[in-house]
A protein has these predicted regions:
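A short, compositionally biased
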Residues: 70-74, 133-139
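Anion-binding (especially nucleotide phosphate/pyrophosphate-binding) glycine-rich loop
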Residues: 1-123
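DPxDG-like acidic metal-binding loop motif
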Residues: 66, 122-126, 136, 173
Length: 288
């Protein structure tokens, strides 16, 4: 397994240009252990890359981080009775399609989120009440960097919260390898379930803006983030190469901005919302 320099631009859906000194794609546990052994000699931070739909590279070059993108053995989908085991690099949307095809009504929301399983678990991704990873995940398998071995965490041990988990809280401790999900709730009318899923997908596409974006910038609180941003957007700098979409005020669209430009836009927005509304906007996007 090679550890190389790598342009990171394609690994973030907002497409800010960035490069890494250290990057690797482990295809097996032994590859991952090799990467972690290398990391221990360099004392680098670790960042796991997935589909890139919730990440912002804030710098043009990284030399103190080992970027890891799991492939190979970590890309699988296996059904075993009332559980489905899915690898960390497997597409959440693809998993959703597979589960809908066999009548699993709890997994419509998988089809709406552009993430991989590992990233979705880390973020406790979801679309609303009753439609979060925590509601369907039974357990996860992860590599415990501190202990140097694979460990299994049950749902309650994952400490799932709104857009949070123990994995996110301890980024240099755990690496998600796979997750087990319950498939006990099945319906007989597959066509009706497929039609309902297609309708949800179409609705989501119609309400989301086009262009390079990482999706939601801030978490929602008692006042939706988009509503906060809408009230102060006229005071934001329109010439930085990125802007909040009028179609969805919590989405930043990138035209030609750098990571630094977008960070400045995020900070300015937080400052203005605090001044105007006395609300602290908390980042949902993962900033590296």
């Amino acid at each position: 397994m090679k550890i190389t320099n790598q342009e990171l631009t394609k690994f973030s859906t907002i497409r800010t240009k960035s490069f890494a000194k250290y990057y690797c794609e482990p295809e097996s546990i032994s590859d991952l252990e090799e990467a972690l052994a290398f990391n221990s000699t360099k004392n680098l931070s670790i960042v796991i890359l997935g589909n890139g739909s919730n990440i912002l590279f804030s710098k043009s070059f990284y030399e103190n981080i080992l970027f890891i993108r799991l492939t190979g053995d970590f890309n699988f989908f296996k059904i075993n009775h009332d559980l489905v085991s899915i690898g960390a690099s497997y597409s959440l949307k693809l998993a959703g399609r597979e589960l809908i095809r066999i009548g699993c009504s709890d997994y419509i929301f998988f089809n709406l989120i552009p993430a991989c399983i590992g990233g979705a678990v880390t973020q406790n991704a979801g679309t609303g009440i009753g439609e979060e990873i925590k509601d369907v995940c039974v357990s996860i398998s992860c590599f415990d960097i501190l202990k140097g071995k694979i460990v299994n965490l049950m749902n309650e041990e994952c400490l799932f919260e709104y857009r949070n988990s123990i994995i996110k809280k301890k980024p240099n401790r755990y690496i998600v390898l796979s997750a087990n999900f319950s498939i006990v709730n099945k319906v007989k009318d597959i066509k009706a379930l497929v039609d309902k899923t297609k309708a949800r997908i179409s609705e989501k596409i119609n309400r989301e803006p086009s262009g390079y974006s990482f999706g939601s910038t801030f978490m929602n609180s008692s006042t939706p983030a988009w509503e906060c941003i809408k009230s102060i957007r006229f005071r934001l700098n329109p010439s930085c190469g990125a802007f909040f979409s009028e179609k969805h005020n919590n989405w930043i669209i990138n035209k030609n901005a750098s990571g630094e430009n977008i960070i400045a836009l995020i900070k300015d927005t937080q400052k203005l919302v605090k001044e105007e509304l006395n609300i602290d906007l908390i980042n949902e996007v993962r900033i590296i």
